């Protein structure tokens, strides 16, 4: 049976690579809905190729031009954040690929879980912000959440057939990003253009900056805690510059299982869509004979304090991970716009975490309020520093 997909963030890096997978298996997958923020040209191009039933754009000001440009298609055209949250619940949809960037992915993911859709999760901020709510809802509605992140896919694959109570440690690998070998002095003057030159992965701008600052890895620690039910004390980050070992699990008997592969996001995307099957592909293979070495290093929290801030946010709990995410979204954008220096980002995040209102047992409405408050605090701190 052909599975019907809704792709949230179809014009972004994960969204476009998901469409690559769908092109390779037209007998297995069909695009039911395409949703994007505001990249109207790419969205129109995708709609004309895949003929979805629904096309949705978050930016309501683009509704009329989008509708006009898709007038030749027999499809529904919707606009707005609420429309995206409604699209994911449509009965014909089997899998929702949650690839929207940042906090914007939270509400539609919640609605998709409530509707019982299989979730292929690429939006890690959803679990960073509201991991407890997401996991409780998934359990209540018997909704599978399949990780798309290469690291969490590797952990997931390493745990197939294993008892999770026998996990001793999760070994979460990180490339180290473009500034892995930089001194603090060198990092004082790096620019967004420098940070966007990732050595191994092809990703969107926001996540590439997060990778450079190692906030992305901090988010992945939090994501792993919720996905696999492991306390953060049992999650160890290893800097692995070659990006061949995507992550590993160490068990209570001392054995380690790892997943290796070329740094190509289409592989974990395909696995999330096809699980529990594996589909034959022509993706690049790793030639083990050609590998000179596989190295692993301790992360340097002095040069990359964002990773430590993520661990701290999880230990404090409550709404603090939501504060962490909101402040990071503010400084990430500010850095890309030249309003914030690279090393300043962690300072603003730490100050925001110290000043934001703490809520020990947040509900959904608390997360919404926390996100708004933390963004406001972070902007105020940025203005004072500029």
Predicted regions and their residues:
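Catalytic, metal-anchored helix/loop core of enzyme active sites in primary metabolism
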Residues: 1-386
């Amino acid at each position: 049976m052909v599975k019907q997909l809704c792709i949230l963030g179809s014009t972004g890096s994960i969204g476009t690579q998901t469409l690559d997978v769908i092109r390779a298996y037209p007998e297995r997958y069909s695009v039911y809905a395409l949703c994007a923020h505001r990249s109207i040209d790419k969205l129109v191009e995708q709609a004309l190729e895949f003929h979805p039933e629904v096309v949705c754009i978050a930016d309501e000001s683009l509704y009329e031009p989008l509708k006009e440009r898709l007038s030749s298609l027999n499809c529904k055209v919707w606009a707005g954040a609420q429309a995206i949250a409604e699209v994911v619940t449509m009965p014909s949809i089997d899998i929702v690929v949650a690839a929207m960037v940042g906090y914007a992915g939270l509400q539609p993911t919640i609605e998709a879980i409530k509707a019982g859709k299989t979730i292929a999760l690429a939006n890690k901020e959803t679990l960073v912000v509201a991991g407890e709510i997401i996991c409780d809802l998934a359990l209540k509605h018997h909704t599978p959440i399949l990780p798309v992140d290469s690291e969490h896919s590797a952990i997931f694959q390493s745990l197939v057939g294993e008892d999770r109570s026998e996990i001793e440690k999760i070994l979460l690998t990180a490339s180290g990003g473009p500034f892995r070998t930089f001194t603090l002095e060198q990092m004082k003057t790096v620019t967004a253009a420098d940070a966007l030159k990732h050595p191994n992965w092809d990703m969107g701008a926001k996540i590439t900056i997060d990778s450079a600052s190692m906030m992305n890895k901090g988010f992945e620690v939090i994501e792993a805690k919720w996905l696999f039910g492991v306390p953060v004390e049992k999650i160890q980050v290893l800097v692995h510059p070659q990006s061949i070992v995507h992550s590993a699990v160490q068990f209570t008997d001392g054995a380690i299982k790892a997943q290796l592969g070329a740094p190509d996001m289409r592989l974990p995307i395909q696995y999330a869509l096809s699980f529990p099957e594996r589909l034959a592909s022509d993706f690049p293979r790793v030639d083990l004979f050609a590998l000179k070495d596989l190295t692993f290093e301790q992360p340097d929290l002095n040069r990359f304090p964002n990773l430590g801030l993520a661990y701290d946010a999880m230990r404090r709990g409550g709404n603090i991970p939501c504060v962490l995410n909101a402040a990071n979204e503010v400084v990430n954008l500010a850095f890309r716009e030249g309003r914030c220096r690279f090393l300043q980002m962690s300072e603003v995040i730490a100050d925001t975490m110290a000043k934001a209102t703490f809520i020990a047992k947040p509900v959904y409405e608390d997360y919404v309020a926390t996100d708004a408050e933390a963004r406001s605090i972070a902007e105020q701190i940025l203005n004072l520093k500029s």
